[in-house]
Amino acid sequence: MQPDLHCRTLAAHTLKHFRALSPLTHCMTNDVVQTFTANTLLALGASPAMVIDPVEARPFAAIANALLVNVGTLTASRADAMRAAVESAYDAKTPWTLDPVAVGALEFRRRFCLDLLSLRPAAIRGNASEILALSGMALGGRGVDTTEAALAALPAAQALAHQIDCIVVVTGEIDYVTNGQRTLSIPGGDPLMTRIVGTGCALSAVVAASCALPGAALDNVASACCWMKLAGQAAAERSEGPGSFIPAFLDALYHLDVEAANEEN
């Protein structure tokens, strides 16, 4: 099936709901991106919480609006905490999102991520290599970098979405968002987004938060991708390199006006 281009008018409408709701988003993410992830959510209007201790993670996941599990700096004790949080979210019907960082490169995290799939994530966000590995169609990938184009992983994403009954996002130069039956494409962004640590991980947090919104999950998640792409483009226009890009990106998220960007394009 051919992907449809996501509608920016819908993304603008979804952003208004996102800012009004300010989803409380429980982020169990990796150590490298904690601050950037929290600031990204705050800039867009969400409420981040970085609760990681197993004793606290289980009850907190039940009261949050959404949960993110990012396995970038996975340890055995952190896996226990994540598993407890996901089980709690599952029982409470809290939508949770999996970011399977480098899942094809390391066996411990691969087995952990595959085990979590039985607890029905609302969304999975990864690059092409990660989605191919998680679907069982390929193993490998060099850490968080992708060795495949997003389009090459689209059949794997569609199959995984159909199998798990969730939304799968494959990110790249063009992002693809699918529920297994319908697929949306989101172009845009800027190469500078790949020259700093954490844009993909932060997107996963925004995807998680968007899953807390009412309405069609596919459209909400595609809107999240659109917001990040537009902010990346705007930030790149006023940046000289990676160092100035980060604050410009956060400012662009804070001031994001999807309707105005739509008129400019």
Swiss-Prot record:
InterPro entries, alphabetized: Hyethyz_kinase, Ribokinase-like
Function: Catalyzes the phosphorylation of the hydroxyl group of 4-methyl-5-beta-hydroxyethylthiazole (THZ).
Binding residues annotated for substrate, in chain numbering: M50, G198
Catalytic activity: 5-(2-hydroxyethyl)-4-methylthiazole + ATP = 4-methyl-5-(2-phosphooxyethyl)-thiazole + ADP + H(+)
Pathway: Cofactor biosynthesis; thiamine diphosphate biosynthesis; 4-methyl-5-(2-phosphoethyl)-thiazole from 5-(2-hydroxyethyl)-4-methylthiazole: step 1/1
Keywords assigned by UniProt, alphabetized: ATP-binding, Kinase, Magnesium, Metal-binding, Nucleotide-binding, Thiamine biosynthesis, Transferase
Co-factor(s): Mg(2+)
Any GO molecular function: hydroxyethylthiazole kinase activity
UniProt-listed Enzyme Commission number(s): 2.7.1.50
Gene: thiM
SUPFAM superfamilies: Ribokinase-like (SSF53613)
A single BP term in Gene Ontology: thiamine diphosphate biosynthetic process
Name listed for the protein in its UniProt record: Hydroxyethylthiazole kinase
Pfam families: HK (PF02110)
Family: Belongs to the Thz kinase family.
Annotated binding of ATP, by residue: R125, T171
